[in-house]
Design a protein with these regions (language model features):
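Phosphate-backbone binding and catalysis cores of DNA-processing enzymes
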Residues: 1-133, 138-141, 145-147, 285
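A short, conserved structural fragment
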Residues: 63-72, 76-77, 159-169, 233-241, ...
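Short, amphipathic alpha-helical interaction segments positioned at domain boundaries
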Residues: 88-103, 180-201, 205, 261-272
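Positively charged, polyanion-binding regions of nucleic-acid-associated proteins
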Residues: 111-128, 191-207, 229
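Loop-centered beta-sheet repeat module
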Residues: 148-225
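Non-catalytic regulatory appendages
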Residues: 231-284
Length: 347
């Protein structure tokens, strides 16, 4: 299988070139988790994959608790369905705590102090959903002084411990609520089963991909990623490309569009962030700075061919720019991609 075939299958498996999903929460569960550090762009990542969806549809799913937002992998914010949150946290949180241990120390956040703060937060959230600023004030009233930065790590700790997650937006303000309002704590956890489950979810929705890609996306160690891959059933296949082994779930070719399509990709989309090796969709002819590595991609045929920009206050003005202005591309397809983005944001 060559690079073009890999791109074609990835776009199909990630539900970008085609999909049968109609509900935001169905898509999120299929993907396992969707990076959501850029909140507005994360909502567009859902809209990109489900035709005729609007931002109001995604907001409604979030407000109803069908999708929640929390630190989950690597670590950064992700969209996830509540029922998947606890078993994934049980798998990934210990590794994340180790990775950010130096930050805990930097802000003098001992385990005792963080548990005390989270107990105060948990008690406060029983009554009502609260913003970060409101929670920080309550914690301070109880005698635990923090800075804006240190309190961010307390919130992160609370999310990793399965105590809190996103609640219903209060206007443009993010609020927090108890995860237990959506899903009960785990009564049992078998690590090997969770590894297998996450590997199956990843390679089904993002294959063809390598073990290294899986480890990069999940934040798990290479050892754990390999173990998870060993649990893949015989339904999965593998092949070698440039000396690397790729795993995927074979798909009926009738359901894989031959045309990879043209899309305005959101920042930090799963099509890019899911893979450690990005050479398959990065054109070496075009210099892409680290700042641009996950920003505003104009994707043509599964390759990054340019960038796009829009005015948040005036979506009628969307500008696209090709890295190579002389390159022949389907301008109608670009106009359609712009129209899809604008349609998603119509109120």
């Amino acid at each position: 299988m060559d690079n073009q075939e890999i791109r074609t299958l990835r776009l199909a498996n990630q539900q970008i070139s085609s999909t049968d999903f109609t509900q935001p929460e169905e898509l999120v569960q299929y993907l396992g988790a969707m990076q959501a550090q850029e909140y507005a762009m994360a909502k567009w990542a859902i809209g990109l994959r489900i035709p005729n969806l609007t931002v109001q549809d995604v907001d409604a799913a979030i407000d109803a608790g069908k999708i929640i937002r929390m630190h989950l992998l690597r670590p950064t914010w992700h969209f996830i369905v509540p029922e998947d949150s606890r078993w994934i946290l049980a798998l990934t949180a210990p590794q994340i705590h180790k990775k950010i241990k130096s930050f805990y120390s930097k802000f003098d956040l001992t385990p005792k102090k963080m548990h005390q703060a989270c107990s105060i937060i948990e008690e406060a959230l029983v009554e009502k959903e609260l913003t970060r600023k409101e929670l920080a004030a309550i914690v301070a009233e109880k005698g635990i002084q923090t800075t804006s930065q240190s309190f961010s790590f307390i919130i992160l700790f609370g999310e990793l411990e399965g105590i809190l997650c996103s609640g219903k937006m209060r206007g443009n303000q993010a609020v927090y609520t108890l995860l237990s309002k959506f899903v009960a704590p785990l009564t049992s956890f078998i690590r090997e089963e969770a590894l297998a489950k996450l590997a199956i979810r990843y390679f089904t929705s993002r294959g063809p991909a390598t073990v290294q890609d899986f480890a990069y996306w999940s934040g798990l160690s290479i050892k754990d990623a390999r173990l998870g891959t060993q649990f893949l059933s015989n339904d999965f296949s593998s092949f070698l490309n440039d000396g690397k082994e790729y795993w995927y779930l074979p798909t009926n070719n009738a359901y894989v569009p031959n045309d990879c399509g043209t899309f305005l990709f959101p920042d930090f989309d799963e099509y890019g962030i899911s893979y450690k090796n990005r050479d398959i969709f990065l054109n070496k002819e075009y210099p892409i700075s680290p700042f641009m590595e996950h920003k505003h991609w104009l994707m043509v045929g599964g390759m990054i061919e340019g960038t796009w920009q829009s005015d948040k206050s005036d979506l009628s003005e969307v500008r696209t720019e090709l890295f190579n202005p002389k390159k022949r591309v389907n301008q109608h397809a670009i106009h359609k991609a712009v129209a899809n983005y604008q349609q998603f944001h119509l109120k």
